[in-house]
């Protein structure tokens, strides 16, 4: 328990140190030293490994009589002299405590001077890093900064794989090269609905996809007939849609009943005929225009006929009045102009018999 308390105290002091090289040394010592030395059997005495011997030869040799199994330099401060006292131990089992997990060496962090990766021989990695820190001050400062980042909670979590529940997983690469993805992208590119896109079949109601028995499939209005085509100049050219005989017959019968369609009626008629509402609306507009022109022409013809009949009747009535005057007997007290007109009309109709009538009338008047 004393060793555990000492380790916790040194770990807390390592975070509080202001010198980066000292913080690096203490963090490496914490990674090297186990928390429970009594739980692990000591290593059998034997010759040191080649890596530790090479690292110890490169580092300055400690004074004789001092026990320094890790190859670390004795710390300059007296409060940190208990770091090298526990012997180096290798874990015989896998501890799962919180302190054990936190004391595990973290993954190497990419920096100016990379730390050596964690391996079973912790003494060789720590001794080599301490030797490089003592050889060059610049390398020691970089290693200290990297060790401080590794010893911090962010550095401990840096080597772990990151999983974010808020970010969705990356989509498979085939999504961007499939026809369905291209259709979805086309909807984003074109603001019009999918029924009006070039080369796309219109989206009808579910019952319209199964054509009714009275509809002729050969003469039915196909979606490509009303699609947008491009001229050789690159300009848009709208083709005129053609309708089947059954569709025109139903439209004409509906137009005879009513000249204008409300919204629900237009939608119902378009659904029953397999047409779009815009097609029905445009057809009724064109049909009303045609009906107005035809009605205006008929009215003009009827007016002309009525005017001609009126003139004929007027002329006939005038002739009848003249005939009535001619058929009446001659009044001797009438004016000379009227008598002259009657004589001229009589000459034109009967020839030379007018003189006889005149002579015959004179004796009667004289007597």
Curated annotation (Swiss-Prot):
Residues 236-295 bind DNA. Pancreatic beta cells. It is found in: Nucleus. Residues 102-268 are annotated as: Repressor domain. Residues 36-133, 294-367 are annotated as: Disordered. Residues 48-59, 78-91, 110-133 have a biased composition (Low complexity). One of its GO terms (cellular component) is nucleus. Residues 306-367 are annotated as: Involved in DNA-binding. Gene3D superfamilies: Homeodomain-like. Keywords: Activator, Developmental protein, DNA-binding, Homeobox, Methylation, Nucleus, Repressor, Transcription, Transcription regulation. GO terms for molecular function: chromatin binding; DNA-binding transcription activator activity, RNA polymerase II-specific; DNA-binding transcription factor activity, RNA polymerase II-specific; DNA-binding transcription repressor activity, RNA polymerase II-specific; RNA polymerase II cis-regulatory region sequence-specific DNA binding; RNA polymerase II-specific DNA-binding transcription factor binding. GO terms for biological process: animal organ morphogenesis; cell differentiation; cellular response to cytokine stimulus; cellular response to peptide hormone stimulus; central nervous system neuron differentiation; glucose mediated signaling pathway; negative regulation of oligodendrocyte differentiation; negative regulation of transcription by RNA polymerase II. It holds the Pfam family Homeodomain. Its main location: nucleus. Transmembrane segments: none annotated. Residues 304-317 have a biased composition (Basic and acidic residues). The modification Asymmetric dimethylarginine is found at residue 189. Transcription factor which binds to specific A/T-rich DNA sequences in the promoter regions of a number of genes. Involved in the development of insulin-producing beta cells in the islets of Langerhans at the secondary transition. Together with NKX2-2 and IRX3 acts to restrict the generation of motor neurons to the appropriate region of the neural tube. Belongs to the class II proteins of neuronal progenitor factors, which are induced by SHH signals. The C-terminal domain contributes to sequence-specific DNA-binding. This is Homeobox protein Nkx-6.1. The gene is NKX6-1.
């Amino acid at each position: 328990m004393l060793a555990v308390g000492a380790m916790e105290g040194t770990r807390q002091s390592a975070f509080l140190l202001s010198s980066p090289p000292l913080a690096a040394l203490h963090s490496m010592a914490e990674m090297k030293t186990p928390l429970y030395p009594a739980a692990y059997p000591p290593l059998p005495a034997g010759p040191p490994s080649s890596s530790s011997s090479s690292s110890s030869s490169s580092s300055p040799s400690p004074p004789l009589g001092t026990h320094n199994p890790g190859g670390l330099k004795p710390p300059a401060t007296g409060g940190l002299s208990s770091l090298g006292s526990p012997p180096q131990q290798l874990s015989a089992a896998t501890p799962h405590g919180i302190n054990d997990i936190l004391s595990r060496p973290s993954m190497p962090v990419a920096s100016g001077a990379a730390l050596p990766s964690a391996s079973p021989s912790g003494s060789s990695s720590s001794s080599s890093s301490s030797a490089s820190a003592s050889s060059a001050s610049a390398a020691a400062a970089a290693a200290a900064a990297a060790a401080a980042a590794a010893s911090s909670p962010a550095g401990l979590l840096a080597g772990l794989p990151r999983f974010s529940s808020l970010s969705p997983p990356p989509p498979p690469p085939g999504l961007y090269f499939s026809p369905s993805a291209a259709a979805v992208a086309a909807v984003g590119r074109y603001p019009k609905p999918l029924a009006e896109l070039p080369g796309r079949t219109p989206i009808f109601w579910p019952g319209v996809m199964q054509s009714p028995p009275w509809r002729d499939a050969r003469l039915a209005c196909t979606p490509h007939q009303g699609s947008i085509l491009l001229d050789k100049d690159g300009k848009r050219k709208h083709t005129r849609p053609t309708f089947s005989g059954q569709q025109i017959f139903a439209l004409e019968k509906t137009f005879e009943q009513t000249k204008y369609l409300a919204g629900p009626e237009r939608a119902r008629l378009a659904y029953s005929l397999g047409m779009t509402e815009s097609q029905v609306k445009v057809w009724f507009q064109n049909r009303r225009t045609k009906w107005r022109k035809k009605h205006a022409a008929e009215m003009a013809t009827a007016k002309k006929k009525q005017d001609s009949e009126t003139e004929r009747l007027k002329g006939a009535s005038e002739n009848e009045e003249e005939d009535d005057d001619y058929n009446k007997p001659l009044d001797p007290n009438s004016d000379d102009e009227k008598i002259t007109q009657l004589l001229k009309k009589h000459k034109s109709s009967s020839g030379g018999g007018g003189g006889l009538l005149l002579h015959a009338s004179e004796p009667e008047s004289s007597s």
